[in-house]
Amino acid sequence: FGGFTGARKSARKLANQ
């Protein structure tokens, strides 16, 4: 669902840091 996708996007953003 949307929440899962958002969490994945956030995790990717953190990894990019």
Swiss-Prot record:
Location (main, coarse): secreted
Annotated keywords: Neuropeptide, Neurotransmitter, Opioid peptide, Secreted
Gene Ontology BP annotations: chemical synaptic transmission; neuropeptide signaling pathway
Annotated compartments: Secreted
GO molecular-function term, one example from the UniProt record: opioid peptide activity
GO cellular component, one term: extracellular region
Keyword Transport: no
Organism domain of life: Eukaryota
UniProt function note: Ligand of the opioid receptor-like receptor OPRL1. It may act as a transmitter in the brain by modulating nociceptive and locomotor behavior. May be involved in neuronal differentiation and development. When administered intracerebroventricularly into mice, this peptide induces hyperalgesia and decreases locomotor activity.
Family according to the record: Belongs to the opioid neuropeptide precursor family.
Protein name: Nociceptin
Native organism: Sus scrofa (Pig)
Lineage of the species this protein comes from: Eukaryota, Metazoa, Chordata, Craniata, Vertebrata
